[in-house]
Structures are given as C-alpha cells and as structure tokens.
Amino acid sequence: MTKNVAVAPNTRPEMYKMMCDAVERSGAALTGVEDAEGLIWADPARPELFPEIAEKAASLQWIQLPYAGIEPFANNLDPKWRWTCGKGVYAPAVAETVLALALSLSKNLHGYARATEWSGPVGRYLHGSNVTILGGGGITVELLPLLAPFDCVTTVIRKKDENLPGATFTYTPEKLEEVLGTTDLLILALALTEETKGIIDKKSLSLMPPHSHIVNVARGGHIVTDDLIEALKEGKIAGAALDVTDPEPLPADNPLWSDQRCLITPHIGNTPEMGLKLLDPFIEENVRRFINDEELLAPVDVELGY
C-alpha cells in the first residue's frame, strides 16, 4: 500500500516538476496538499507560504525541505511532524567550491584578477597547512578527501564529541579559541543556530595568525561582518573568501567589495544546475523510504534546529 505525497508550492517550475517526477518514480501517489501524508517543499525562498499550505493538510506526517540550511523555517518546526532536509545532498558541490576558494586565496588569484598592471609574485603553499574546519557534517566529510593530497593537518570542530574519519584531530567547540592560534586556513561549514551565530567575531579574528585565511560556505551570519572588515583592514588576517555574507546579498557599498584581500562569490557553492541533479535522486529515495516505513535520510532535530 502506498502513501499520498504532495509537492508545493508551484512557484519554481523547474524544481516543482523535478520533485513531482521524483515522487511518481518512488511509487507514491502524487496528490494535492489536502490529501497529503507527506509534503515535499518546492521553494526554499518562500517559507512564508508554509503555514497556509500546511494547514490544509490534515493528514500530514512528514515534511521534506529542499536545502540543508533550514533557518527560514525555524518558526514552523512543529514536532508533531517528521522533518527532513537536504543536508549532505549538496556536499560534493560545496566541497569543490571550498577547495577552489582556498586555492584562490593561497595563490592570490583574487588579487591578480583585479590587477590592471604586472605586479610582483604573491602566494603561498596550501600543502601542509593547518586547516581548521567548523562543522562535521556532509560538506566536511566530502572536503577531507579533497584536502588529503595536500597533506594538511585538519582539525574539525564539531558539537559531537566523536572523531571524524579523515580528520587529523576532532574537538568540541570549547577548543576553538585554542586551535585558532595555529590555524592557517579556517573553513566554515556548519549549521547556523543561535549558538553559532557570530561565532567568528573580533575576539576570534584577533586570535588568528596574520597570515591566515578564512573561507565561508556556510551562512553569512556565522561571521560578524563589521569585525571581519576591521580585521582585514588592520591586517589581523591575510584574506577571506566568502560565498555567503551578512547581509545577503551584500550591499554594493559594503567595504568588502573593494578590499583587495577579500574574494566574494554570490552563494554559488551549490547552483541550480548542480543542485537539481543532486536533489532529484535524494527526493526519490526519501519518498520511497517514507512509503515503506523505513528510516528517512537527513532527519531534522527540531530541538537543535538542524
């Protein structure tokens, strides 16, 4: 016996169609919201539509959100429903972006891209660097093998007090300040929660070596933007690569745009071209698990918010 699964809202046609096709391939009955036992959310940019749509689904048991970051839905995380998200789905694409940004910083590609005349050589070796990664989720799991050929000393800071395979060291957040003092490259790949908001601030930046770099592919809110601007201006760190910013989009008059030590990309760690291809089989598999009463992939802890 199958189950009824709806896809909503129909505001992003390409994503909506992909999700509908995935539901049908899974063996579930694609239905309207009113009859749905499962709901596949089809527009991560429209969380304000959720309450009205969910209210129509009297038999709703499970909600699948498309992205790993679910903070726009934080006010809707009712424990009466089972929640899953896209954590881990986009990790391969985002991990590639991290490596590209890290290499760009180490070779000063962002500086040379802005140059209008020939200049002297600037850059350093990524090989053997002390790399600190905040977050022990899917992005980090995919990133560690990419860093392995560079023989980096990798330190993962994660909430779970458990070694992460592939990392040289794994610590809980209490060790962060101690670790920052020997960090050559700091990578942010963690969930945004009340605990992690502003985790990189003036104090954190002051602990880092002057030659250190930061790569942020998580959420802009992890870094206090004004503190980063000051740290770059005063030479407290050597550079930053930001695929996410706070605010986002970053206003055109923000000083980070003109700072030669800052590389900004417009949240392209996971583009629609990459994301839909990765999300398609994931949705199909999770719906199949739902209708067969199997363990669901990427469950959300409602209490933790991720």
Spans of features found by a protein language model:
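Rossmann-like adenosine-cofactor binding region
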Residues: 161-255
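Oxidoreductase and adenylate-handling cofactor-binding alpha/beta cores
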Residues: 95-111, 149-150, 280-289, 294
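Rossmann-like dinucleotide-binding domain for NAD(H)/NADP(H)
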Residues: 211, 217-306
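Phosphate/diphosphate ligand-binding glycine-rich loop within oxidoreductases
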Residues: 38-113
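Short, conserved loop/helix-junction motifs that constitute active-site signature segments
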Residues: 51-59, 74-79, 205-211, 231-235, ...
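N-terminal glycine-/charge-rich "phosphate-binding" loop or analogous flexible N-terminal tail
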Residues: 1-45
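NAD(P)-binding Rossmann-fold cofactor-contacting core
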Residues: 149-166
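Glycine-rich NAD(P)-binding loop of Rossmann-like domains
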Residues: 111-142, 169
